[in-house]
A protein has these predicted regions:
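Internal alpha-helical transmembrane segments of multi-pass membrane proteins, especially GPCRs
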Residues: 7-10
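C-terminal segment of classical bacterial N-terminal signal peptides
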Residues: 15-27
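Positively charged n-region of N-terminal signal peptides that target proteins for export
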Residues: 1-5
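Signature of Gram-negative chaperone-usher
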Residues: 26-219
């Protein structure tokens, strides 16, 4: 009787062990799952605030500086992570832009074709004083079509030659840069150059000023 009991216990234990060997892999194997964590990043744009511009030299108030324009420049740095880039526009707060008071001023530059920049700066006529600007983007391809040149004319071609394509400042925004991709973290240094010339226009002594505003907007 005892032998039968021991045999039965042994058989049961063997069956249990065999069952464990069969089922153990299912118990020990791992199962896994994953999730995707998403964080949105919005587009932003910044523009620097450069110091005010002092032109390269004073202009004699009676004889003027015909044939020897005075020059100045400023650089606005634009940074954006916007995938489609930005546009930058320029405008003046007054007409004419460069003024001393209600009587004495520099006329806004007068290009040969209205609203189209002159490839070369046009000398001021007798008794005339003028103020104008041009733009030199950090990336030539970003130059607005109006300020691109083909080596002899503006609003044409794909170049942006230095010290070319001069235009009058306007109280209406004029697009000077059009970039279609984001910038680097360092941004794009956009140079705006200014010139003044007087051909014996009588100008009262003083510091004439023009307030020029640059606006950068995401595309």
């Amino acid at each position: 009787m005892m032998k039968r009991i021991l045999s039965l216990v042994l058989i049961i234990n063997l069956m249990a062990y065999t069952g464990f060997l069969v089922s153990e892999p299912d118990i020990a194997n791992a199962v896994e799952d994953s999730v995707v964590v998403t964080q949105g990043v919005t587009a932003e744009i910044t523009i620097s605030s450069p110091i005010d511009v002092t032109m390269s030299a004073d202009i004699p108030g009676i004889t003027g500086n015909p044939g020897s324009p005075r020059t100045g420049a400023t650089t606005w740095t634009v940074i954006t992570n916007n995938n489609t880039g930005f546009v930058m526009s320029i405008k003046s707060t007054s007409t004419p832009s460069m003024i001393l008071d209600g009587t004495y001023n520099f006329s806004d530059y007068s290009p040969v074709a209205v609203n189209v920049p002159d490839y070369s700066w046009g000398a001021a006529g007798a008794g005339v004083a003028e103020f104008g600007y041009t733009v030199e983007p950090a990336t030539v391809a970003d130059t607005a079509t109006l300020f691109k040149d083909n080596g002899s004319a503006c609003n044409a071609g794909a170049s942006n030659s230095a010290n070319t394509c001069w235009l009058n400042a306007s109280t209406t925004d004029v697009t000077v840069i059009n970039r279609t991709t984001e910038t680097t973290s360092a941004g794009e240094d956009e140079i705006v150059r200014f010139q003044t010339e007087s051909n014996a226009k009588y100008l009262k002594e003083g510091n004439y000023g023009a307030t020029i505003t640059a606006t950068a907007t995401m595309n």
